[in-house]
A protein has these predicted regions:
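CN hydrolase (nitrilase-like) catalytic-core segments centered on the catalytic cysteine
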Residues: 4, 10-114
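C-terminal beta-strand edge segments of enzyme domains
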Residues: 66-199
């Protein structure tokens, strides 16, 4: 067992509700991933701020991985040097403690691994100092609702789940009224399948 693990990718980290949902489930190890090899050093700087802030706020370790493109791959993607410049830098593979400290040496270029032992007592130590989902959260005033119920991409005005119409036959394609610009209006003559409301 390694602890409670949560994960977000790239700019999902700028959705505070998504991050808070993981905090509220008491993640201890947060796995994050950013593409890397793009935009330059500013992207790596933004990434560092983001993962260190989440580590502090969540009182969790953050294990961050970034991709890396070598020069051969960059040349295959971008035909000109001007475009290739946007595919360099911006990488920061690192592990951050719940106190916001980077463990060991981060990897900012090339392929490789960053490995560290995680002392999970630091999670408790940080939460004793400040717990974002503890009393500090003021749940009597503010709380996040996660609706895990199954949803449909469409509902009718009555609130009932939609029912599909039966398939149209080859013969019907030759007899449809082509004078109307509304193709759905041409389907009204079909009989809805069992359980579907009449149109």
């Amino acid at each position: 067992a390694v602890g409670r693990v949560g994960a977000l990718a790239c700019w999902e980290h700028y959705n505070p509700l998504a991050r808070y949902a993981l905090m509220a489930q008491h993640e201890e190890i947060h796995c994050s991933q950013f593409p890397g090899s793009m935009v330059g050093q500013i992207f790596a700087d933004q990434m560092e701020v983001t993962i260190r802030h989440h580590a502090l706020e969540a009182a969790a370790f953050v294990v961050n991985a970034t991709g890396w493109l070598d020069e051969t791959q960059v040349a295959q993607i971008a035909p000109t040097e001007a475009l290739r410049g946007a595919l360099r830098g911006g990488s920061l593979t690192a592990i951050v403690t719940p106190e916001g400290r980077i463990l060991g040496e981060p990897l900012t270029s090339g392929e490789g691994l960053v490995v560290a032992d995680l002392d999970l007592t630091l999670v408790t130590k940080r939460k004793r100092m400040m717990d974002s989902v503890g009393h500090y959260a003021r749940p009597e005033l503010l709380h996040l609702v996660i609706d895990a119920r199954p949803t449909s991409p469409m509902t009718s005005e009555s609130g009932a789940a939609p029912h599909p119409l039966p398939a149209i036959t080859i013969e019907e394609t030759h007899t449809r009224d082509r004078s109307t610009s509304d193709p759905l209006a041409q389907l009204d003559h079909r009989t809805p399948i069992t359980g579907a409301p009449a149109r």
